[in-house]
Amino acid sequence: MAADPSPPSAMAQPRPLNLNNEVVKMRKEVKRIRVLVIRKLVRSVSRLKSKKGSEDALLKNQRRAQRLLQEIHAMKELKPDVITKSALNDDINFEKTCKKPDSTATERAIARLAVHPLLKRKVDALKAAIQAFKDARQNAPEAESSKSASKESQCEDIPRSQAEASESQHPERTVVGEQKGKDKDPTTAKKAGSGSKEKLAKGKQGPKAVATPHSPGKPSEKGAGINSERQGAPTPGNHSQGKASTRTTEDSVCEPDDNSISKEEVSEEEKEYFDDSTEERFYKQSSASEDSDSGDDFFIGKVRRTRKKECAVPSSAKEQKPLPKVSSKTNTLETHWDIRNDKHKLIPEARKLESVFFHSLSGPKSSRRDPREQAPKNKAPDIPENEPPIQNKFTKSARRGFESAKQPSYAPLHPSWEASRRRKEQQSKIAVFQGKKITFDD
């Protein structure tokens, strides 16, 4: 039978193989295989006993059945560990054991169980694991010896490489030594020393000569008189360059100051501006007559306070401060501010002839186009233009009283409060006519 390609877990693990543990793990498999073999033998015994034929054939079948019963009893008495150990130790051949005339029932039972495919698969896997473990133990000292040999060879290679590197450097040293030997003569040494000194002096003088025109404040010792004369009478070009540099520095100093002042003014104007659209709309809708009196009253909140503070500041303090350079951003902000003020001043003047209930209808087209007061387009107007005026049932006295009720100006209220007040007034006027009896003349 072919061995199982997948070895057990113990084989895969690197720890040393413990055979006793593997034998103990095999107990369950051995018991299961023993039950299967006993069932098969019982069926074969019953088949042999049921066969019919001549007397010789019947006797032969009885002897076979007797031997199988002996094997069954031997299997029941055997322990699983004995079966696994015997299967691992020897290569058992069932046919050879059965042909032996002196073979016992236990031997035949062990051979029969060891030959079973399931147990044979497990046993072959264990044998392979044991063999691998033995090979690993045998190869371990060989591997250690090979490692030590490789380390020694590496250690030997390092000094060799160092020696080769030193040898490669030695020829240069020899050449330098020969040159030194040649230069030992006093005349040649003096000449070489004088030549080197001259070269050094020239090298030192070169950078000084180059540096003198750039740094007139540090003249050399040789040309001190010439440099002093040049310093005493500087050229006009240098003067102009110095003035230009001073101007550029002054401009660069002044520019950040102007920028900082303009930024501060812009930030102050942005802080001072406070536009609460809800308050503005409420103030316009509730008190149109008051708006017509004072042009700047539509500003609510912080704008009034800031304007009062600016008016309170004396003009002398403003004259003392120099006017800073205003940037283009501040100019644009001021123009926007003035345009907005002019627009808002024109709105209350145009609203002098407004009706009490419908501001948007009585005002001009420009006021109707104001997005804050423009009604949504999908809603139908309260009073269509083409319809005739509704015939009022009120008497002349009631109309006069209603008109007189319109005249007194109330204090500015919230729009919801004004609507509730008007609704109550209308209900009180209508309640007068509900209790009257209608009489008809004959």
UniProtKB/Swiss-Prot annotation:
<feature type="cross-link" description="Glycyl lysine isopeptide (Lys-Gly) (interchain with G-Cter in SUMO2)">
    <location>
        <position position="202"/>
    </location>
</feature>
<keyword id="KW-0832">Ubl conjugation</keyword>
<keyword id="KW-0963">Cytoplasm</keyword>
<dbReference type="InterPro" id="IPR015158">
    <property type="entry name" value="Bud22_dom"/>
</dbReference>
<feature type="modified residue" description="Phosphoserine">
    <location>
        <position position="277"/>
    </location>
</feature>
<protein>
    <recommendedName>
        <fullName>Serum response factor-binding protein 1</fullName>
    </recommendedName>
</protein>
<feature type="compositionally biased region" description="Acidic residues">
    <location>
        <begin position="266"/>
        <end position="278"/>
    </location>
</feature>
<comment type="function">
    <text>May be involved in regulating transcriptional activation of cardiac genes during the aging process. May play a role in biosynthesis and/or processing of SLC2A4 in adipose cells.</text>
</comment>
<feature type="modified residue" description="Phosphoserine">
    <location>
        <position position="292"/>
    </location>
</feature>
<feature type="compositionally biased region" description="Basic and acidic residues">
    <location>
        <begin position="167"/>
        <end position="188"/>
    </location>
</feature>
<feature type="region of interest" description="Disordered">
    <location>
        <begin position="358"/>
        <end position="442"/>
    </location>
</feature>
<keyword id="KW-0805">Transcription regulation</keyword>
<keyword id="KW-0175">Coiled coil</keyword>
<feature type="compositionally biased region" description="Polar residues">
    <location>
        <begin position="237"/>
        <end position="247"/>
    </location>
</feature>
<feature type="compositionally biased region" description="Basic and acidic residues">
    <location>
        <begin position="367"/>
        <end position="382"/>
    </location>
</feature>
<keyword id="KW-0597">Phosphoprotein</keyword>
<comment type="subunit">
    <text>Interacts with SRF. Forms complexes with SRF and SRF cofactors ARID2, MYOCD and NKX2-5. Interacts with the N-terminus of SLC2A4.</text>
</comment>
<feature type="coiled-coil region">
    <location>
        <begin position="118"/>
        <end position="140"/>
    </location>
</feature>
<keyword id="KW-0804">Transcription</keyword>
<dbReference type="GO" id="GO:0005634">
    <property type="term" value="C:nucleus"/>
</dbReference>
<dbReference type="InterPro" id="IPR037393">
    <property type="entry name" value="Bud22/SRFB1"/>
</dbReference>
<dbReference type="GO" id="GO:0030686">
    <property type="term" value="C:90S preribosome"/>
</dbReference>
<feature type="cross-link" description="Glycyl lysine isopeptide (Lys-Gly) (interchain with G-Cter in SUMO2)">
    <location>
        <position position="329"/>
    </location>
</feature>
<dbReference type="GO" id="GO:0048471">
    <property type="term" value="C:perinuclear region of cytoplasm"/>
</dbReference>
<feature type="modified residue" description="Phosphoserine">
    <location>
        <position position="362"/>
    </location>
</feature>
<keyword id="KW-1017">Isopeptide bond</keyword>
<feature type="coiled-coil region">
    <location>
        <begin position="55"/>
        <end position="77"/>
    </location>
</feature>
<feature type="modified residue" description="Phosphoserine">
    <location>
        <position position="215"/>
    </location>
</feature>
<dbReference type="GO" id="GO:0030490">
    <property type="term" value="P:maturation of SSU-rRNA"/>
</dbReference>
<feature type="modified residue" description="Phosphoserine">
    <location>
        <position position="294"/>
    </location>
</feature>
<feature type="compositionally biased region" description="Basic and acidic residues">
    <location>
        <begin position="149"/>
        <end position="159"/>
    </location>
</feature>
<dbReference type="Pfam" id="PF09073">
    <property type="entry name" value="BUD22"/>
</dbReference>
<feature type="region of interest" description="Disordered">
    <location>
        <begin position="137"/>
        <end position="336"/>
    </location>
</feature>
